[in-house]
């Protein structure tokens, strides 16, 4: 066969060249070192020696290039590149090949022999790429299959253990720090609906006073708190709006006072003047037939008269923190010495009093008031709120006072049912530019025209503007906000309680504690920024099991605020509807022109500093003279 003969001749020629190269290996090494050639030429000699031994079995090499030097250089380069990338040959193997190529011995050349280059030499150049891809797929699939579960499962188990470990540590660390267990295990509220005040160890004269005020059965917060307070324990009571928190702390205080009357027996702190006045009226009514001396210490009144009243040692002081702190700083020791023997201290709406929110915070004044009160071991401290904030909860985690029973916590519907079940929450979408038009027509719908309404605003300027506007539109309206004199605030609230005014436009000073049973609708003209403020606002209606509606005006930019409120109260607002009423049509037909004209008149009255009704406001000098 000519081809076989030619192949044998080629191999003989190659063998002769190989022997000559081996004999001249040192010279070649020196040339390579001087010229900087790669080790491929040295590899070429060793690979030819291997090929000479396996030439009889490899018929595919007959199609190779006649120039064995060029062919072997290309194959060697390709073999090294592929072996590095696909076969995983390490850099240490390459270093050994370089050293063996420099030595030029046959034994060193044999050490370069490996299965990977020999396999490539036996495959044809045409099929080489395909075979390499198949080998790569097999090599990739083989190690990856068992590795996947290793990397997927092991770290997850580690993370799980790490996630569980801190919880256990936190629980072990937090448990001894708590002075009391969970509220549910601390106070067992009687679930019997027929429970009476007599069963709570309330004195008969107080039961009769409660009956005279149409209070026949205790509520949940009253069932839980009254017996424990009578035992001398400090209390943190949380319950939704309109659940009778004032009675829960007033009854045990009055019962203890009647048994041992003394000067300044208790101090009650509230965040607003109107709430302080309301508590004073309720406490005096409950104290009948006993004669209780109570003093109201709030802003807007003469401090000299208040100082004289404090010096007379009244039985009970109902105050706002700011004004009482002013007396502590400025009045003499004769005025405030009676505060050092107080038996009870009550923080009503404690979440607002203890809020440390920077501007407008009452906490510094509260701390000033506590600075002259007896130490905790010599008094009872009672906290009541409708929203359990972190500041309030932190007080329950304090260590118990030595020699005293631990603080007990009674929470009734403060989180899941912060909104009464009898309250309907609704929203009304209104354009920002025509909010007043929609308000006017909403108040005149057949279902709302006779109902008592409270409209809440975020700013005193907005409340003042709506007061002017609604009066010009012939609504029976009054207002309540911090820019009004105290005497006018009391008069306006009295008019609304007596139904002389159907609508009360107010800021958040009226959002807490005020108990006006006749209120049927609460309108959020401006949406509050804090969802807890929303809870207190809508709590002015649907009190003590009565029904009520809360309607929130929603503009284009108020969606996020509404979603936050819904998440906080756990209930979604429904769209406001009234049968047979298309509010948008009524606004376009009846309100655009009329409300626009009255709006300009109201703004003009405010600019001219006129009171509601068109009378010019009296100057400060005349007010002081009176």
Curated annotation (Swiss-Prot):
Positions bound to ATP: 239-246
Catalytic reaction annotation: ATP + H2O = ADP + phosphate + H(+)
PROSITE patterns (UniProt xref): DEAD_ATP_HELICASE (PS00039), HELICASE_ATP_BIND_1 (PS51192), HELICASE_CTER (PS51194), Q_MOTIF (PS51195)
Protein name as annotated: ATP-dependent RNA helicase dbp-8
Disulfide bond annotation, renumbered to this chain: none
EC number: 3.6.4.13
Highest taxon of source: Eukaryota
Primary enzyme class: hydrolase
SMART domains: DEXDc, HELICc
Chain intervals with Basic and acidic residues compositional bias: 161-173
Any Gene Ontology biological process: rRNA processing
Cross-referenced SUPFAM superfamilies: P-loop containing nucleoside triphosphate hydrolases
Places the protein is found: Nucleus, Nucleolus
Compositionally biased spans, kind Low complexity: 1-25
Lineage per the UniProt record: Eukaryota, Fungi, Dikarya, Ascomycota, Pezizomycotina
Record organism: Neurospora crassa (strain ATCC 24698 / 74-OR23-1A / CBS 708.71 / DSM 1257 / FGSC 987)
Domain Helicase ATP-binding: 226-406
GO CC list: nucleolus; nucleus
């Amino acid at each position: 066969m000519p081809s076989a003969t030619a192949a044998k001749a080629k191999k003989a020629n190659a063998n002769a060249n190989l022997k000559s190269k081996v004999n001249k290996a040192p010279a070649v090494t020196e040339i390579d070192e001087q010229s900087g050639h790669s080790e491929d030429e040295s590899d070429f000699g060793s690979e030819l020696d291997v090929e000479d031994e396996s030439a009889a079995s490899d018929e595919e090499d007959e199609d190779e290039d006649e120039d064995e030097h060029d062919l072997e250089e290309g194959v060697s380069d390709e073999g090294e590149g592929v072996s590095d990338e696909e076969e995983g040959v390490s850099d240490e193997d390459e270093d050994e090949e370089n050293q063996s190529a420099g030595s030029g011995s046959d034994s060193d050349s044999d050490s370069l022999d490996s299965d990977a280059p020999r396999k490539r030499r036996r495959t044809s150049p045409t099929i080489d790429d395909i075979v390499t891809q198949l080998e790569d797929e097999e090599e990739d699939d083989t190690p990856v299959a068992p590795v996947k579960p290793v990397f997927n499962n092991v770290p997850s188990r580690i993370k799980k253990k790490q996630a569980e470990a801190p919880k256990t540590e936190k629980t072990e660390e937090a448990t001894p720090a708590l002075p009391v267990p969970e509220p549910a295990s601390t106070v067992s509220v009687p679930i019997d609906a027929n429970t009476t005040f007599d069963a709570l160890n309330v004195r008969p004269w107080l039961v009769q006073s409660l009956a005279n005020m149409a209070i026949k059965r205790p509520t949940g917060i009253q069932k839980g708190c009254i017996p424990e307070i009578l035992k001398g324990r400090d209390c943190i009571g949380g319950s939704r709006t309109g659940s009778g928190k004032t009675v829960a702390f007033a009854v045990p205080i009055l019962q203890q006072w009647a048994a041992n009357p003394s000067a300044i027996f208790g101090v009650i702190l509230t965040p607003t003047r109107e709430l302080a006045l309301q508590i004073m009226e309720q406490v005096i009514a409950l104290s009948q037939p006993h004669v209780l001396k109570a003093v109201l210490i709030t802003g807007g009144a003469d401090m000299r008269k208040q100082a004289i009243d404090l010096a007379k040692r009244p039985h009970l002081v109902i105050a706002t923190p700011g004004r009482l702190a002013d007396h502590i700083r400025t009045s003499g020791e004769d005025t405030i010495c009676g505060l050092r023997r107080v038996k009870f201290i009550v923080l009503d709406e404690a979440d607002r009093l203890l809020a440390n929110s920077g501007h407008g915070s009452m906490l510094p004044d509260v701390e000033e008031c506590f600075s002259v009160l007896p130490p905790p071991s010599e008094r009872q401290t009672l906290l009541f709120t409708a929203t359990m904030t972190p500041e309030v909860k932190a007080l329950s985690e304090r260590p118990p006072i030595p020699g005293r029973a631990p603080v007990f916590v009674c929470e009734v519907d403060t989180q899941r049912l912060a909104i009464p079940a009898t309250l309907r929450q609704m929203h009304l979408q209104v354009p920002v530019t025509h909010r007043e038009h929609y308000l006017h027509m909403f108040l005149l719908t057949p279902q709302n025209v006779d109902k008592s309404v409270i409209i809440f605003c975020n700013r005193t300027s907005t409340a003042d503007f709506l007061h002017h506007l609604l009066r010009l539109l012939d609504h029976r309206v009054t207002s309540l906000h911090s820019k009004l004199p105290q005497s006018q605030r009391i008069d306006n609230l009295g008019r609304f309680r007596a139904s002389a005014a159907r609508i009360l436009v107010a800021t958040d000073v009226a959002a807490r504690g005020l108990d006006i049973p006749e209120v049927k609708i609460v309108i959020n003209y401006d949406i509050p920024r804090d969802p807890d403020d929303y809870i207190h606002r809508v709590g002015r209606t649907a009190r003590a099991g009565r029904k009520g509606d809360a309607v929130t005006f929603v503009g284009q930019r108020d969606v996020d605020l509404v979603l936050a409120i819904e998440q906080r109260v756990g209930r979604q607002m429904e769209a406001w509807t009234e049968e047979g009423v298309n509010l948008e049509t009524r606004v376009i037909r009846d309100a655009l022109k009329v409300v626009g004209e009255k709006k300009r008149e109201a703004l003009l009255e405010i600019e001219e500093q006129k009171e509601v009704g068109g009378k010019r406001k009296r100057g400060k000098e005349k007010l002081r003279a009176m």
